[in-house]
């Protein structure tokens, strides 16, 4: 079984140790190194070439966003997940623009952390459910006010195929993604396993011709396929 090699960069030792402890419980994960500032991140990644870097956004010297930008340019094979206490849209979009593949709030639970690392390691993107919900609400607010959320270009692809290509279960999962639920939360609500939820999400992304969960939700809202609750 191939291991997912992980580096943790966070200037708070207790939090860093807590994250490592959670990841150590997952047999397919291996934390290969830790660091406590953004300036150190590049040296660590150059040496270990991890699959995933978990990066705190607020650190002395070089902050997490600047460190992420540097890592993406120098070591694009190492995918970065940002850790933050901020759920504001500006923080999230700034982090994603630098090339981060994930954005987690530090209030996350263990299941969300593990799920995010798995998704990002497999080449996907992951946003904390609360962040997804906030971004969707902001997009909806801009849409209803007649202001374009992306005036320069269309970020989210238009759907050329009708929604009825989704099964009823996939429609239920799509609605719960819009509600900001994690895979675990969806599974508990529908009484199905997290693995089954992941399969449904993968099918939804493929059928909707989008890259990640956030795009799927935003496109669904634009087309009136889900309710904002």
Swiss-Prot record:
Question: What's the impact of mutating residue 98 to I?
Answer: Increases phosphorylation
Induction per UniProt is: Phosphorylated DegU activates its own expression.
- Give this protein's Gene Ontology molecular function annotations: DNA binding
4-aspartylphosphate, modified sites: 56
Q: Name one GO biological process term.
A: phosphorelay signal transduction system
Could you confirm whether the keyword Phosphoprotein appears in this record? yes
Explain what switches its activity on or off, per the activity regulation comment.
Phosphorylated and unphosphorylated forms are both active and have different functions. A low concentration of phospho-DegU is sufficient to activate transcription of flagellar genes, but a higher concentration of phospho-DegU is required for transcription of other genes. Phosphorylated DegU is stabilized by DegR.
* Keywords linked to the UniProt accession: Activator, Cytoplasm, DNA-binding, Phosphoprotein, Repressor, Transcription, Transcription regulation, Two-component regulatory system
Q: Name one GO cellular component term.
A: cytoplasm
Pinpoint the HTH luxR-type domain residues: 159-224
Gene3D superfamilies listed in its UniProt record: 3.40.50.2300
Q: Which residues bind DNA?
A: 183-202
Q: Name where it's found.
A: Cytoplasm
Note one Pfam family from the annotation: GerE
Q: Where is the Response regulatory domain?
A: 5-121
Q: What is the effect of changing residue 56 to A?
A: Prevents both swarming motility and pellicle formation
Post-translationally, this protein is described as follows, namely: Phosphorylated and dephosphorylated by DegS.
Q: What function does the entry list?
A: Member of the two-component regulatory system DegS/DegU, which plays an important role in the transition growth phase. Involved in the control of expression of different cellular functions, including production of degradative enzymes such as the neutral and alkaline proteases, flagellum formation, biofilm formation, and competence for DNA uptake. Positively or negatively regulates expression of many different genes. The phosphorylated form is required for synthesis of degradative enzymes, flagellum formation and biofilm formation.
Quote the entry's note on domains.
Answer: The N-terminal region acts as an inhibitor, whereas the C-terminal region carries enhancing activity.
Q: What is this protein called?
A: Transcriptional regulatory protein DegU
Upper lineage ranks? Bacteria, Bacillati, Bacillota, Bacilli, Bacillales
Q: Which gene encodes it?
A: degU
